[in-house]
């Protein structure tokens, strides 16, 4: 026989569980879904069996480094062929074969975003885009910055399969004549079609956070913790959280690299260590279980 207190606790848990079920469709990434499955067995079953939750698959750090072709195929299969959006950020172990397997099983994909997936090649991307273009189906978004080896010929061929040139995030840089991503500039004086700072990241120094150009004597830049010689404009550097040791911030795209410091005082501000300072201290990165 349950006591009144036990019944109240059970009712409260049911209410919490109902709220969590409502929240599930709004979760951003696979990391968040995998975190939620640990709450309860019923929630785990709901996530595993609800096809609608898997029509958008987002895999980014810290899970990216462990993603293989087989794991990608396993998770994409949970959409039962209804996958619409595939976002893989810096998934170095994903190959052309793995991506093609997902595309063949999900012919309704409209967005492929694979920045930094260096295990892919231009030929593999083109085969996937060509496969998806059958039956008058066209990709709405194709982001492939960081996939090495694209040429003008590859770009011209891709345009024939895409709904518009704006679909793809690569173009020919007017400075170096190479196929690279050319970000827009938010600086007021550069807000024109033939702006002087129009060029790729290698030709024009830019803020890693807002992409504003950092050319001219009136601009000031600060070093970021991201590595790769990334810099930030002074405005972004001032507002971004900084490593408690070296006082360098991460840009938003690399914020997952922060190693948060547990705090016991509720009045204390959250703090973190950048990767360089964290590993210098001899600690180990945390791991996330892929199992559902």
From Swiss-Prot:
GO terms for biological process: embryo development ending in seed dormancy; protein ubiquitination. Keywords: Developmental protein, Ubl conjugation pathway. PANTHER family: F-BOX PROTEIN SKIP28 (PTHR13382:SF16), MITOCHONDRIAL ATP SYNTHASE COUPLING FACTOR B (PTHR13382). InterPro entries: F-box_dom, F-box_LRR-repeat, LRR_dom_sf. It comes from the Eukaryota. It comes from Arabidopsis thaliana. Component of SCF(ASK-cullin-F-box) E3 ubiquitin ligase complexes, which may mediate the ubiquitination and subsequent proteasomal degradation of target proteins. Required during the endosperm development in embryos. This is F-box protein SKIP28. Part of a SCF (ASK-cullin-F-box) protein ligase complex. Interacts with SKP1A/ASK1 and CUL1. Residues 21-79 form the F-box domain. Pathway: Protein modification; protein ubiquitination. The F-box is necessary for the interaction with ASK proteins.
């Amino acid at each position: 026989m349950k006591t009144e207190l036990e019944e109240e606790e059970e009712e409260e848990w049911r209410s919490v569980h109902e709220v969590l079920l409502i929240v599930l469709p709004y979760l951003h990434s696979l990391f968040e879904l995998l975190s939620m499955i640990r709450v309860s067995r019923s929630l785990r079953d709901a996530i595993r069996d609800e096809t609608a939750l898997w029509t958008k698959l987002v895999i980014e750090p810290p899970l990216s480094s462990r993603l293989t072709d087989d794991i990608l195929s396993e998770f994409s299969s949970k959409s039962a062929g209804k996958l619409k959006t595939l976002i893989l950020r810096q998934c170095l172990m994903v190959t052309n074969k793995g991506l093609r397997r997902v595309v063949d099983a999900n012919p309704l994909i409209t967005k492929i975003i694979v920045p930094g997936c260096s295990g892919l090649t231009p030929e593999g991307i083109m085969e996937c885009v060509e496969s998806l273009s059958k039956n008058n189906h066209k990709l709405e978004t194709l982001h492939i910055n960081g996939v090495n080896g694209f040429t003008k010929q590859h770009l011209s061929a891709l345009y024939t399969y895409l709904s518009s040139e704006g679909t793809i995030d690569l173009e020919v840089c007017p400075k170096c004549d190479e196929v690279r991503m050319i970000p827009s500039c938010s600086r007021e004086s550069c807000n024109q079609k033939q702006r002087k700072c129009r060029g790729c990241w290698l030709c024009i120094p830019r803020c890693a956070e807002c992409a504003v150009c950092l050319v001219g004597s009136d601009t000031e830049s600060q070093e970021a913790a991201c590595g790769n010689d990334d810099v930030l404009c002074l405005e972004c550097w001032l507002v971004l959280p900084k490593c408690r040791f070296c006082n360098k911030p991460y840009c938003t795209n690399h914020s997952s690299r922060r190693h948060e410091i547990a705090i016991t005082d509720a009045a204390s501000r959250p703090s973190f260590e950048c990767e360089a300072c964290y590993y210098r201290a001899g600690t180990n990165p945390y791991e996330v279980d892929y199992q559902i």
